[in-house]
């Protein structure tokens, strides 16, 4: 089947939409421009689309008809609007498979727009790369009943959410958020600033300052059919041993709370919250000196990972090299292992799965090695420990396959826990590679990242199709296309959607319209529920603001659209 596609650019807002027409000459649609404003246009196509042999893009010249309707009526293509231009007309063959549909969807976006979006929206790779509000350009897109979607929220809550997400989309504020914090601290105004943040951004993206405060939200989410991922949201601490011990104890407390409802709860851990980042980087260097492919490491490195790192450091000294690890580093590494032992052993005892967060690539080989070591120990019967795979990395798919082969090998034979994400450190990764004149570990375009993510999703669901208990999968994404792909593949592969080893994950305070749609489809959906003292969670909030800047300009436009729609429905 041939589809005619017209791409429309709104010159005022720099957004575009694709209008698709299945051999129908009349197309009506709308393009959002500002709060509550819909600009309508009518496009009449006289292009002969009956020739099914046409497979390539066709350029056309279009006449823009101004408000006075002065036009050349003999022109074969008339666009009635004063601020819209047709920039592309093409005929597209309908793809044969779901995965082809998703990859074509992404690759058909304008490269210049997407590359700019990919480079500027620094920390957001859980977003869709489409612009504008929901429209009917793709039958897979959502068109939700907002009265049902937001039935649990008051009008005040809806307006509050809209305002916070809108502020996060302002580049000047999000780009300079850390500078504002530093300025207020220099002026001695940290306390009033923290008070303001607590009742604004913190309230939107965090569930409280203590684990007990989060229980109100977890109960509310559970009643709505949504599970929780309890997250002590400390980005990193370069502090004392006591500080790291405190973080470990808070994580253990999340496990104890989650154990009250283990089938509907996760915990999570970020290793730079348990050890000084520079020490973790040294550990990464030690394991990378052997190999960057964790599956190639000797069995002893998994059975006794602490001894492995200490022995690697000793080997360097014997070779006449300067010791990579100081006596202080060795002491800290031993304490780090004690904290990990405590956390993962408690998860295993209580039956609570835990997600190990991904971090920058210069920590990641060590993180992979440590996570696989504990997975081998505790994931024999079911996935308890989940590793995170960043699909925006060049080696993302290779690493995922290597770890799956490791888990299914006879010498280890454990259940792989896999959380797949796009990634969140593009700017720091790119800046570091430029500074060190090394190869950028991040894929060059957003289209490559979309393809990598969707390929990983298909690969993992294929394994679950063959053996429902082989893998634990967390599909962590706010990308509507990837979510649609996941639900379609689950149906196509005839996988039970209630399988406890498959779940979708999204962030608290974001993408509620996607979360509730998954509930309606009887999929298992979990929300990250962060908590912690306001002043310690500020780095997390800044990262959320950066991610929302990109998310607002794309998939979150849809969330704003639904929020506005419901507010207007209630008020007018």
From Swiss-Prot:
Family, similarity comment: Belongs to the proline oxidase family.
Gene for this chain: prodh
Q: Which InterPro entries match?
A: FAD-linked_oxidoreductase-like (IPR029041), Proline_DH_dom (IPR002872), Proline_oxidase (IPR015659)
Q: Which domain of life is it from?
A: Eukaryota
Pathway annotation: Amino-acid degradation; L-proline degradation into L-glutamate; L-glutamate from L-proline: step 1/2
The entry's keywords: FAD, Flavoprotein, Mitochondrion, Oxidoreductase, Proline metabolism, Transit peptide
Q: Which organism is it from?
A: Dictyostelium discoideum (Social amoeba)
A Gene Ontology term for the protein's cellular component: mitochondrion
The protein in question is named Proline dehydrogenase 1, mitochondrial
UniProt-listed GO biological process terms: proline catabolic process to glutamate
Which cofactor(s) does the record list?
Answer: FAD
């Amino acid at each position: 089947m041939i589809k005619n596609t017209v791409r429309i650019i709104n010159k005022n807002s720099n957004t575009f939409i694709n209008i698709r027409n299945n051999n129908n000459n009349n197309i009506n649609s709308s393009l959002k421009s500002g709060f509550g404003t819909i600009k309508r246009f009518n496009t009449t196509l006289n292009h002969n689309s009956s020739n099914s042999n046409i497979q390539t893009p066709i350029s056309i010249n279009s006449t823009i008809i101004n408000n006075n309707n002065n036009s050349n009526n003999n022109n074969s293509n008339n666009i009635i609007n004063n601020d819209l231009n047709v920039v592309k007309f093409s005929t597209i063959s309908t793809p044969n498979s779901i995965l082809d549909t998703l990859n074509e969807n992404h690759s058909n976006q304008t490269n210049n727009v997407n590359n700019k979006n990919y480079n500027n929206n620094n920390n957001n790779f859980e977003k869709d790369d489409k612009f504008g509000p929901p429209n009917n350009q793709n039958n897979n897109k959502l068109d939700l009943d907002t009265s049902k979607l937001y039935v649990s929220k008051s009008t005040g809550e809806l307006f509050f959410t809209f305002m916070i997400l809108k502020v996060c989309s302002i580049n000047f504020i999000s780009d300079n958020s850390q500078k504002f914090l530093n300025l207020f601290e220099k002026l001695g105004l940290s306390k009033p600033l923290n008070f303001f943040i607590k009742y604004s951004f913190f309230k939107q993206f965090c569930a409280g300052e203590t684990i007990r405060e989060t229980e109100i939200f977890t109960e509310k989410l559970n009643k709505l059919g949504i599970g929780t991922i309890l997250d002590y949201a400390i980005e990193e601490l370069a502090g004392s041993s006591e500080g790291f011990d405190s973080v470990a104890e808070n994580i253990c407390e999340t496990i104890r709370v989650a154990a009250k409802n283990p089938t509907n709860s996760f915990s999570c851990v970020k290793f730079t919250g348990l050890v000084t980042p520079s020490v973790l980087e040294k550990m990464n260097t030690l394991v990378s000196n052997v190999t960057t492919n964790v599956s190639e490491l000797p069995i002893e490195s998994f059975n006794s990972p602490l001894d492995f790192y200490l022995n690697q450091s000793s080997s360097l000294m014997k070779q006449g090299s300067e010791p990579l690890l100081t006596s202080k580093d060795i002491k800290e590494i031993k304490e780090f292992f004690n904290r990990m032992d405590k956390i993962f052993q408690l998860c295993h005892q209580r039956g609570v799965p835990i997600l190990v967060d991904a971090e920058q690539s210069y920590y990641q080989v060590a993180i992979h090695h440590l996570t696989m070591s504990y997975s081998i120990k505790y994931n024999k019967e079911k996935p308890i420990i989940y590793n995170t795979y960043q699909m925006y990395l060049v080696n993302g798919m290779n690493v995922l396959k290597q770890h799956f082969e490791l888990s299914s090998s006879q010498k280890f034979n454990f259940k792989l826990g896999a959380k797949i994400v796009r990634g969140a450190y593009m700017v720091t990764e790119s800046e570091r590679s430029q500074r060190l004149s090394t190869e950028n570990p991040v894929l060059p375009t957003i289209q490559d990242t979309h393809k990598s993510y969707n390929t990983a999703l298909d690969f993992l669901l294929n394994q679950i199709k063959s053996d429902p208990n082989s893998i634990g999968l967390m599909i962590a994404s706010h990308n509507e296309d990837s979510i649609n792909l996941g639900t379609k593949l689950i149906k196509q592969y005839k996988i039970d959607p209630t399988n406890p080893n498959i779940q979708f994950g999204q962030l608290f305070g974001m993408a509620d319209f996607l979360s509730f749609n998954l509930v309606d489809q009887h999929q298992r959906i979990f929300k990250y529920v962060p908590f912690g003292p306001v002043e310690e969670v500020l780095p997390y909030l800044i990262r959320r603001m950066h991610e929302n800047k990109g998310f607002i300009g794309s998939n979150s436009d849809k969330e704003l659209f639904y929020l506005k729609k419901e507010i207007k429905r209630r008020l007018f």
